[in-house]
Amino acid sequence: MSDCYVNNTIFEIKAPEGKTTDCIERNLRKAVNHQSPNIVLDSFRMKNIHNKSIPSFLIERLSRRHGIQRIIFVNLKREAIDINSLLR
């Protein structure tokens, strides 16, 4: 079951706990395979990962697609960044 609707689109909210990008990869896989291809990734609980490195990692994952349609990244400053708009 997905977490929320944004502009009539179902999104799954993920807030992974971890110290590497592996935790992000795992959560993206879970969301796409079992919940929704539209993902909101909140970095609030991630420690020791720089906020600047996460968007580049997400851009790489989105460019490969693998079932992901849209990613919105919420950084530690609580700013929402649409990763799809950075891909273009």
Where do the language-model regions lie?
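Conserved catalytic cores of phosphodiester-cleaving nucleases, focusing on short active-site segments
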Residues: C4-E17
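Metal-dependent nuclease catalytic core centered on acidic motifs
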Residues: P16-R88
